[in-house]
């Protein structure tokens, strides 16, 4: 709790909380080269905890927007860890993703010489994606994030992959991300996690552009973003791990860690 309270020291946007339970493990902050590395490591850590006897229902992965869920959904599926998405649809069930997959399958049926990234980016553009995210929150931003995550999958394919290979990859991912039939790890936006707690929490994707979100520009908006970071951290009863990745497959620039780390880590 003291770790989260560092975010309140300068602005006082919320009354500092006092922990009522036993002292948990020291918070961890970890940087990764790529989003895939980040999510694979988080999935492996979660599987290790479950293998040690921690209930899956006592573990959560939190992120700023729904569009960030695809990479961790895939990593957990690959690790054989059941999960449930709180307050939102699973990635491959979203309307825009279903539309994109139909278009990708149609493109794969008539092979061309286009590189996979070009072919998929053209499909995503036809569905509303662009190189720059919408300036405001809401449905359009969520749709953009989902399509952006779909496009990012192309970066994981071998250089010689075709659009047909990409269609097969998407089919395999859909099959692996089945509905859980038992207690599962929770995936959630920070907003949807308000009021809930878990023994172990992983907060992922903590970069500039996500937390704080791109369209948060005023002092009040940035204060609200800091409050979201605080809310996320305080969802953990015993262990909190905060991670971010430098490499973004759909951007020409590397990402920077969230500015809120400066305040959190000021005293080590």
Task: Locate each region found by the language model.
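Helicase P-loop NTPase motor core
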Residues: 1-81, 107-108, 144, 155-156, ...
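Residue-level signal for pocket-adjacent positions within structured domains
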Residues: 12, 24, 86-87, 206, ...
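Short, solvent-exposed loop/turn elements at beta->coil junctions and helix N-caps
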Residues: 18, 88, 190-191
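General small-molecule cofactor/ligand-binding pocket signal
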Residues: 28-30, 84-86, 188
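Residue-level detector of flexible, active-site-proximal loop/helix-junction positions
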Residues: 33-36, 90, 194
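Conserved beta-strand edge residues that scaffold enzyme active sites
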Residues: 63, 90, 246-247
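Conserved helicase motor
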Residues: 66, 87-94
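Conserved helicase C-terminal RecA-like lobe
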Residues: 69-79, 94-267
